[in-house]
Amino acid sequence: MRLFLSLPVWVAVLAMVLEGPAPAQAAPEISSTLGSIPDKLKEFGNTLEDKARAAIESIKQSDIPAKTRNWFSETFNKVKEQLKTAFS
């Protein structure tokens, strides 16, 4: 019974393999592939630039840099006061 059921499956698979690639699956020519590389690189560069600019703008608009700067200033002043009182 198993052989009877698997035989049509093997015939279908063999027919698909022997048929070869469909026209849409044919490999593109090397010249067209090489010709499109500069356009793809330019598109990648533009996308990367846009994402980098957006990230920088979001960092500029956030309050993280100001909070970090204030924390460092406060910590530095505390350390400076402690050193001043320790060595006075």
UniProtKB/Swiss-Prot annotation:
Keywords: Lipid transport, Secreted, Signal, Transport, VLDL. Residues 1-26 form the signal peptide. It is found in: Secreted. GO terms for biological process: cholesterol efflux; cholesterol metabolic process; chylomicron remnant clearance; lipoprotein metabolic process; negative regulation of cholesterol transport; negative regulation of fatty acid biosynthetic process; negative regulation of phosphatidylcholine catabolic process; negative regulation of receptor-mediated endocytosis. It comes from the Eukaryota. One of its GO terms (cellular component) is endoplasmic reticulum. Its main location: secreted. One of its GO terms (molecular function) is fatty acid binding. Belongs to the apolipoprotein C1 family. Inhibitor of lipoprotein binding to the low density lipoprotein (LDL) receptor, LDL receptor-related protein, and very low density lipoprotein (VLDL) receptor. Associates with high density lipoproteins (HDL) and the triacylglycerol-rich lipoproteins in the plasma and makes up about 10% of the protein of the VLDL and 2% of that of HDL. Appears to interfere directly with fatty acid uptake and is also the major plasma inhibitor of cholesteryl ester transfer protein (CETP). Binds free fatty acids and reduces their intracellular esterification. This is Apolipoprotein C-I. It comes from Ursus maritimus. The gene is APOC1.
